[in-house]
Amino acid sequence: MERNDPRYQAYVEILKEELIPAMGCTEPIALAYAAAKAREVLGVLPDSVQLQVSGSIIKNVKSVIVPTTGHLKGMEAAVAAGIIAGSAEKELEVISEVSEEKKSAIRDYLQTVPITIEHTEQGHVFDIVVTERCGQDYARVRIADYHTNICRIEKNGTVLYEVPLLDETVQEDARADRSLLNMQDIWDFAETADLRDVADLLERQIRYNNAIAEEGLLGDYGANIGRVLLTTYGNDVSNRAKAKAAAGSDARMNGCELPVIINSGSGNQGITCSVPLIEYAKELHSGKEKLYRALIISNLVAIHEKTGIGTLSAYCGAVSAGAGAGAGIVYLCGDGYQAAIHTVVNALAIVSGIVCDGAKASCAAKIASSVDAALLGYNMYKCHQEFKGGDGIVMKDIETTIKGIGRLGKDGMKETNEEIIRLMIE
């Protein structure tokens, strides 16, 4: 793919837009970001806070520890952290620097200031409205569709900033066009890209995500899935790939304060796309250039799949990210495009039934299962086995299958998502 090709430029922009740092699970961090921005607009410490959120936000914040808060969980903790210690200009690193004094102040604020939560659906799966009041003054901030998309800022009845929200397809047009993504072009781009355009992004992903994976194995986080895998199944590369990715999630879901480079708005997906490839590259002595090109494949394949599914869904994002990792591992192992697309199809056929029931400790095990499915899918191809079109949700070709997965995750699982939310808030 030539550098002056519009697809080339779009793919570079997509990677720049997606591979950004975030500290902590991104949904509570988005709440903290909105709260910090509202506090900035209000200009004083609010004496009451009202939070209106979609069900998928409730699902993804309820059970996860908010970093830099001293192991506090939930929406109230995320909002209080943003108000007391947030720096809105840092976006998804909004609460990356919190002193012990501020941690104590967050706890005091939670005990003394009313924070009310309302479950509301306004036509957007990802939707946050934070209203902060002090006396007769108020400030309101809305984030919708994706984690950093502040679409409305209001103070005392005056709209200070507003971006029209139509639907997710139109909203995406503000960023690089994801509809240009397809498997063949992703592969061609990865093979021909001038790495100077993306090397800094990918090196940061390697550094950040490997660091939190290492921390997950050293510390005591959640259910310690990474350590369980290494203890039980040994130290071969396929198990290390699963264990280290799981360990990164162990740490991230359970209060670790290290940042992660995300994919599709998710730290867990960013870890899943990268850490297994880092382990395979070490084992194979692949060199930086080959690892970079493999990471281009894994990241863009995951984004391609997730574009159809949507930002938040009852379809587990680790599944799509794991399939992307499988395609990247194929490249590292020296196989070609046909091996990659069969690996992706096989992986999606195996684990597309995993549901998302929010961010919490078991995400690490789902990541391990998804990476395992990708490795099995690749081994199936090497043994001349495959799931063929007509086998369940497997369609006639890779693009039709990915499109079908998007329909399943976005449309078919709406009711599933609603029932999961009802179960979680009973």
State what each model feature region is.
Residues 1-12, 45-58, 236-255, 287-305, ...:
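Acidic-glycine-rich active-site phosphate/pyrophosphate-binding loop
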Residues 29-132:
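Early transmembrane hairpin of solute transport permeases
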Residues 11-21, 57-65, 251-262, 302-311, ...:
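Glycine/charged-rich beta-loop-alpha catalytic/anionic-binding loops adjacent to active sites
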Residues 21-37, 258-275, 316-320:
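Conserved phosphate/anionic-ligand binding catalytic regions in large, soluble enzymes, centered on
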Residues 38-41, 67, 280-293, 303-369, ...:
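Hydrophobic alpha-helical bundle architecture
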Residues 110-255, 420-426:
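Signature of multi-pass transmembrane helix bundles
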Residues 45-49, 90-95, 117-118, 196-202, ...:
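Flexible, glycine/charged-enriched surface loops at secondary-structure junctions
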Residues 2-3, 8, 22-26, 53-60, ...:
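A structural signal for small-residue-enriched, beta-sheet-centric alpha/beta enzyme cores
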